[in-house]
Design a protein with these regions (language model features):
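Juxtamembrane intracellular "pre-TM" segments in multi-pass secondary transporters
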Residues: 1-2, 179-210, 391
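C-terminal membrane-cytosol helix-exit motif in multi-pass small-molecule transporters
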Residues: 164-185, 370-378
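Helix-loop boundary and gating motifs at the non-cytosolic
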Residues: 1-48, 206-211, 215-229, 233
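Cytoplasmic helix-loop-helix junction between adjacent transmembrane helices
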Residues: 99-136, 315
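Helix-to-loop junctions at the C-terminal end of transmembrane segments
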Residues: 54-66, 254-266, 351
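C-terminal ends and interior cores of transmembrane alpha-helices
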Residues: 76-89, 277-289
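Core transmembrane helices of Major Facilitator Superfamily
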Residues: 19, 100-112, 300-312
Length: 391
């Protein structure tokens, strides 16, 4: 665990601190450029699209260079994207920066997950991965608070500069650990081909993978629903950032209990309730008209997201093949990111009519997703420490 703390958890905390400051601001930044709510929601689509590319690239790069070196490259891309957003006053270059942020973050995510999985036993897998996810959540709680302070002092763009500095600090912390110097043996080329991995894992990908894609859509939508609705009812930028912090604060309290429940009773005990709670929070938002109501909905979203901490990573680790594991994890992340692309895209498309319509559709999708997870998550066998695959 000491090795994970220095090479994984500390750099992750620093990087996610900056990301937490930026995530609530993508849509708000586009709105400040005098674009519509539909275009603002599309910023989350661009971010998710960048993540899809980063997931595919991150799995292959991690297999070739090892997870630590791949993480350094991902962090460099993430910092570069934050700088681009900080200096871009118009839409197109700003969205390019958002895409680069998504690309670098996903590449880093795949690399970090691979390292944790390689260092822990299966019986402790959920707790190790939820601790990683919990590190993100703690940083995502503090990040919006610091972001709100930076915005109040220096304006919206300064938050992106702050994020770039925290990611650079993560690079320094990772390079200070001894693990980055170790380069693994080069794997066989056949292990690196995404098509081979997809073909051999198709029974899992077309069932549980579909449920993961839907979960990604519901979770990603929560990033845009709060700022868009808050803007529509006249809330300030700093108030939105503070509400995000409240949601993240609830979120971060649940990661370790969620991991313990997964390791003892199975993955479905967190995945299904988590998705239902996110659906409930999304469905509640259109019925709110002030900060108190938005905060209540945000707390529901935070509880749901926190209770599902690390579950998608854990499911991917459970079903990943021995050969081509890094590439499979990248493919698994692509499914999550495809969902992350679909959720905000759905809201963006429906926002042309009314925001509430998009929220109701996403909330209904969350209920369907919970049923899919209940159906396809493999039965848990604690005596085997791993779930059995289902036909």
């Amino acid at each position: 665990m000491r090795a994970l703390a220095t090479s994984t958890y500390v750099p992750t905390f620093l990087a996610e601190l900056g990301l937490g400051a930026m995530l609530p601001l993508f849509a708000l930044s586009v709105l400040r450029m005098d674009h519509s709510a539909a275009v603002a929601a599309a910023s989350a689509v661009i971010y998710a699209g960048g993540r899809m590319g980063g997931s595919a690239w991150g799995g292959s790069l991690s297999a070739r260079l090892g997870p630590v070196r791949a993480a350094l490259v991902g962090l460099a891309a993430l910092a570069g994207g934050a700088v681009v957003c900080a200096v871009s006053p118009v839409l197109v270059p700003f969205l390019a920066g958002v895409a680069l942020i998504g690309f670098g973050h996903a590449g880093y995510h795949v690399a970090r997950q691979g390292q944790v999985e390689s260092l822990v036993l299966a019986v402790f897998r959920a707790r190790a991965l939820t601790t990683l996810a919990g590190t993100w959540r703690i940083a995502n709680f503090i990040g919006p608070l610091l972001g709100a302070a930076v915005i109040a002092a220096w304006g919206l763009r300064a938050a992106y500069a702050f994020a770039a500095l925290t990611v650079v600090a993560a690079i320094v912390a990772l390079r200070a650990s001894s693990s980055w110097r170790r380069r693994p043996p080069r794997p066989a080329r056949s292990e690196l081909r995404h098509l081979d991995v997809i073909r051999s894992s198709w029974p899992i990908l077309r069932t549980l993978g579909l449920a993961v894609l839907l979960t990604g859509a519901v979770r990603a939508a929560r990033i845009v629903v709060i700022p868009l609705w808050a803007e529509s009812i006249g809330m300030s930028d700093s108030a939105v950032s503070l509400i995000f912090a409240v949601s993240a604060g609830v979120d971060m309290l649940l990661f370790y209990p969620a991991g313990a429940v997964m390791d003892r009773w199975g993955r479905a005990w967190t995945a299904v309730p988590s998705t239902l709670l996110i659906a409930a929070g999304t469905l509640l938002l259109p019925f709110t008209s002030g900060p108190t109501g938005v905060a209540i909905a945000a707390v529901l979203l935070g509880v749901g997201n926190g209770w599902g901490s690390g579950v998608l990573m854990t499911l991917g680790a459970d079903v990943a093949p021995v050969h081509g594991r890094d590439v499979f994890i990248g493919t698994w992340m692509i499914l999550q990111d495809a969902g992350g692309l679909a959720g905000p895209a759905l809201i963006s498309g429906l926002a042309a009519m009314t925001l509430s319509t998009g929220f109701f559709v996403v909330g209904g999708l969350g209920i369907v997703t919970a049923g899919a997870l209940w159906r396809w998550i493999p039965p848990w066998r604690p005596e085997r420490h791993l779930p059995h695959a289902v036909d």
